[in-house]
Amino acid sequence: MKIFCLGLAGLLLAGTWLFSGCKRQEEVHPIGEFLPESEAFWNVVPRTSVLERIGIEFEFTEGPAWHPKGYLVFSDIPANTIYRWTGKNYVVVRQPSSQANGLLFQAGGNLLACEHGSRSITRLSPDGKLTTIVDSYQGKRLNSPNDLCRSSLGAIFFTDPPWGLPELNADTAKDLPYNGVFRWYNGETTLIDSTLSWPNGIALSPDERYLYVANMEIIPTGGEDQYDVFWMRYQLNAEGEVEDKSIFYKAPDTTLPGGPDGMSVDQLGNLFVSGPGGILVLDKDGTHLGTISLPIAATNMAFGPKDKELFITARSTIYRLSMER
């Protein structure tokens, strides 16, 4: 085990000197299991792929985002911190982070964050300016923005479940009567869907024709609740407006560990989604190709350069899936 610490060297970001704490970065070693449903799985996840654990002892990690300059950022919600991983160590980017969850880089290096604490989406620019992008819809406060993605036009799509509210749907501070999927563009917020119970992860297809959203529905049984877990697909027009929607894939066994959370889409349109049993790999037609099983349930994931690496947040742990052919 190696421990990396920058001490008081710190990191200059957002106009403030921020200091790293000591975080353990494990010596990388293989872990996990590949469970193909068909041979097509190996066309997406090469047989030579290696799953490695690269960080431990966090509290609840989320929101990984890869920067083109070659580093990863992610959030630790209970720790109220956004970290950066350089390949050698972890440094604090922002603390407190207003319990940031989903993260996303814009052109120019702006970092967008879904904040549970402020119930908003904010933008942190390289010069340190923090700006609120959206915090309400039709005069009512958002619940707690969870995850987000953006189009080439600059539109931001995001989910707004109540996970950041202490009493969830029963919280007295909850203003909206639903948990929505939204689109923000040029200062205007549009409601895409108000019918999902627990919308969570969200991603766009490479051609931006489809928007995917993870969801969970609770089925009351009079005893222990059961769940429906499925992923929605929204068909978009050239302006990024929704024209149609349908269930893209429904998990057949929701008793397995893990649930519908974050996701990422590769350059060929294959989806990597956190779900029951691990990370489900789905092709662009919604066929389940196989599962990447982890010892800890994945919360979210993001591709590194050229789809050759997938960085996975899993509660206390950070994984890297190397997919060199």
Roles of regions detected by a PLM:
Residues 56-71, 96-115, 119-120, 138-156, ...:
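Beta-rich, blade/repeat-based domains predominating
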Residues 51-55, 89-94, 131-138, 188-193, ...:
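A short beta-strand motif characteristic of beta-propeller blades
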Residues 81-83, 120-122, 179-182, 230-232, ...:
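A short loop-to-beta-strand structural motif that recurs across blades of beta-propeller domains
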Residues 233-241, 323-325:
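Short loop/turn segments immediately following beta-strands, especially the blade-tip
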Residues 26-50, 79, 242:
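Blade/loop signatures of beta-propeller domains
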Residues 71-94:
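Beta-propeller domains
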Residues 18-21:
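C-terminal motif of bacterial Sec signal peptides marking the signal peptidase cleavage site
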Residues 79-81, 118-119, 163-166, 218-221, ...:
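Short glycine/acidic-enriched loop and turn motifs that connect beta-strands
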